[in-house]
A protein has these predicted regions:
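N-terminal Lys/Arg-rich, disordered targeting/topogenic segments
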Residues: 1-33
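Hydrophobic membrane-insertion alpha-helices, especially the h-region
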Residues: 35-56
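Extracytoplasmic/periplasmic/luminal assembly and interaction segments
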Residues: 80-131
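Short aromatic-glycine motifs in intrinsically disordered, low-complexity regions
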Residues: 74-82, 210-214
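A mature extracytoplasmic/lumenal domain signature
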Residues: 90, 204-206, 230-232
C-alpha cells in the first residue's frame, strides 16, 4: 500500500514536473515568437510598400487603348442629344465606333486637310514631334458651356499678369498667366474673327516640354462643347485650323440620306 502511495506520489511529482517543464517551455517560446511575428509582419508590409512605390507600374487595362481604323463608314453617335455622323477613321476608340450615346467622343485628324486615320499616314499619327501634324478633337457634354468671350472675361482675365495683354505673333493678342495660378507655364492667345474671339491656351516651350500644344475650347450646341489641340509650332495657322475644324464639325452634324447610311452599315 505504501508502495502504491509512493508510486502515486512519484507519478504526481513526475506529472507536476512535466507540466511545469512544458509550461516553462511554452512561456519561453511565447517570449520570442511574438516579437518574431511582429518583425515578420513589419518586414512583409515594408516589402510590399517598396514594391508598390518602386516597381514599374503596369498599364491600366481598365482604360481603353487607342485603336485606329482605316474604315470610312459613318458611325451614328449622340452627345447630350447632339446627333453626329462621323467616319470611323476619325474615331480613336473601338467602343465609339459601335455608335450610340456617349458623354464624350475622342477623335483625331491630320493637318492640313484634317484627314482621318489611314494605313499610309499611320507614322504621322503616332508621332509626337514639335511639329506633329496631328490635331486631337473631343466633343463632350459641358454644363458650364461658356462662349469664348465669356470664358475670357469670367475666367482667364482673373489669372493673367496684365489684363491689357501685348501684341503677339500672327495677329494675336498675347497674355501671360501668373505663376501663382493653375495656368502657369502657359500663354493665352486671343484672335479676333467675324464670329467673335478665338482663345488658344498654349504651353510654353521648355526643356521639359519640347513639343508643346495649344488648346481651344468652344461651344457647338446646347451643353455640348468642342475642344481641340494642336502643336504650338502650327500657331501661325490658327485661323485656318479653326475654320477647317468648323467645317469638319458641321459635316459631322449633317444627317446622311437614309439609304446612304444603311449602305454604310451594311459594309461594316
Amino acid at each position: 500500500m505504501l508502495g502504491l502511495i509512493g508510486a502515486s506520489q512519484a507519478d504526481r511529482v513526475e506529472m507536476a514536473m512535466t507540466y511545469s517543464d512544458s509550461d516553462g517551455l511554452i512561456r519561453r517560446r511565447s517570449g520570442w515568437m511574438i516579437p518574431l511575428g511582429v518583425f515578420l509582419v513589419t518586414f512583409v508590409l515594408s516589402a510590399l510598400l517598396l514594391i508598390y512605390y518602386l516597381a514599374p507600374s503596369a498599364p491600366n487595362f481598365l482604360e481603353e487603348q487607342v485603336s485606329p481604323t482605316s474604315r470610312t463608314d459613318l458611325v451614328a453617335l449622340r452627345v447630350h442629344g447632339l446627333k453626329l455622323w462621323i467616319p470611323a477613321n476619325y474615331l480613336q476608340y473601338a467602343s465609339s465606333r459601335r455608335g450610340g450615346a456617349f458623354k464624350d467622343v475622342a477623335m483625331f485628324a491630320l493637318l492640313p486637310d484634317l484627314s482621318g486615320w489611314s494605313d499610309d499616314d499611320a507614322p504621322s499619327f503616332s508621332g509626337n514631334t514639335a511639329d506633329s501634324p496631328v490635331v486631337y478633337l473631343l466633343i463632350r457634354e459641358e454644363r458650364l458651356n461658356l462662349t469664348e468671350a465669356d470664358r475670357l472675361a469670367r475666367i482667364y482675365m482673373a489669372h493673367v499678369a496684365d489684363n491689357k495683354g501685348t501684341a503677339g505673333p500672327f495677329g494675336l493678342t498675347q497674355y501671360a498667366f501668373r505663376d501663382d495660378t493653375g495656368y502657369r507655364n502657359e500663354d493665352l492667345f486671343v484672335g479676333q474673327t467675324p464670329t467673335g474671339p478665338q482663345l488658344l491656351r498654349c504651353v510654353r516651350f521648355s526643356p521639359r516640354v519640347p513639343s508643346p500644344s495649344c488648346l481651344r475650347d468652344t461651344p457647338i450646341a446646347h451643353d455640348v462643347a468642342l475642344s481641340y489641340r494642336f502643336k504650338r509650332a502650327h500657331l501661325a495657322e490658327w485661323r485656318q485650323i479653326g475654320q477647317a475644324i468648323g467645317r469638319l464639325v458641321a459635316r459631322f452634324k449633317e444627317e446622311p440620306r437614309e439609304n446612304a447610311l444603311q449602305g454604310e452599315q451594311r459594309r461594316r
